[in-house]
């Protein structure tokens, strides 16, 4: 049973009453017997309800290799969004939360944990004699100075909490970047509520918090006495990460295919960050404009987590949620986020073996300790190559799709029977070759192109008795979606006609929507997904309004 200690709590800590939204979150936690709120967040559209209760918060560190048997101090537990994750990975967790009501609901949310102790109160008032392997300071440092720009305040705080670390212990910090790309694009500042408020060093009254540039945060960490640190760049931000890069692994190619930004309020946007990442990467500027920073800090030890990149699919649930990590030793590992994902992990291994037996090139994988392990390969993906070649040589672009389609046809034996569960199945249509097993991830983003050969990887999903043309449809659909000017060089209509997809495209769109909506849990996350949509016309209007305002001032 989780223990809650309140003797160090001072009533003035709760001078700010909980909002109605926070009171509702407390009620939701009290009524829920398990830490699973998918149904609830599908029904309640409020942002803070989603943020405090979604499992997606765990993506910040569910890929991180905590040392076995370790102890962790969480400072600022909030409503316990990350507390359960820490309990899963560490032998003992102590969570400190300044609000008594929040502390009570951390206890309620994780009441069945046997390795969790919760303190209500300010960390400076609590005489915890224990020292820890890890201290987690997630989204709290910005508030320590109550909006002050004085770096000494933040350095002193980091130095004081560092006294609770064991020798060789690690402080883990997650903060906003003042120069984050979404804020450069016009998103409201998180602590002022006004676009560009901290970027232009405005004279607005102090905000509720203060965010940092990378150099500013580096100086604060160094002045606190931490001699060693490692920066990670969670994208789109630290609250709901999908990709986590590091200083030792900066993207070299487009992020559009794997990253979906979101906005709490998109009404003030002047640009869309996903449109800018290609230029950011080409100009080596990601470390300056990443929306958030995640930092490991140590006073005297450089033995940091050996993960240099992580891609997480926490949104896909317990059976299909994975962390794919690149390690400093040159290995790539694919790890199920929950034990329920082990069967799917074995399926992926089987898929690779079957494709290899069909004389196709695949990245060789081994199943070790409930992980898939494979070598890191520095080749370009076919997707990246297609983006280049369509502009230089459209004929080669077409030939590459011929090559891909031939590989799809080669991947499995053929059957005469179409799967009747195919969404929108119409027996009057000619679907072409039906594969006994259709490996639907045989698309350019999951394929390397090297020495004129296709080398497939991460072949996760298989559909039995599906059309080969459906796999090709997926390859074309996403290629044209992510190469926005592809139509200038060769039209999608021409490609559809070449492969006999004209009469099938609409039916395949129905099947694809059905697959993606189930895979990405649209029903559960539809309120969040609304925040990923942007109004491009609205951005143009915003830009024109700025121009008109400038002319009036002249």
Report each predicted region and the residues it spans.
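Conserved SAM-binding loop of SAM-dependent methyltransferases across substrates and taxa
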Residues: 79-90
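ATP-binding glycine-rich loop module of kinase domains
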Residues: 313-350
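A short glycine-rich, Lys/Arg-flanked "PGG" loop and its adjoining helix->strand segment in the class I
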Residues: 152-170
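Short alpha-helix
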Residues: 207-231
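Catalytic activation segment of kinase domains across protein kinase-like and atypical kinase folds
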Residues: 202, 425-488
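Conserved class I S-adenosyl-L-methionine
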Residues: 172-195
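Conserved structural core of kinase catalytic domains
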Residues: 363-420
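N-terminal auxiliary segments of SAM/dcSAM-dependent transferases
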Residues: 1-32
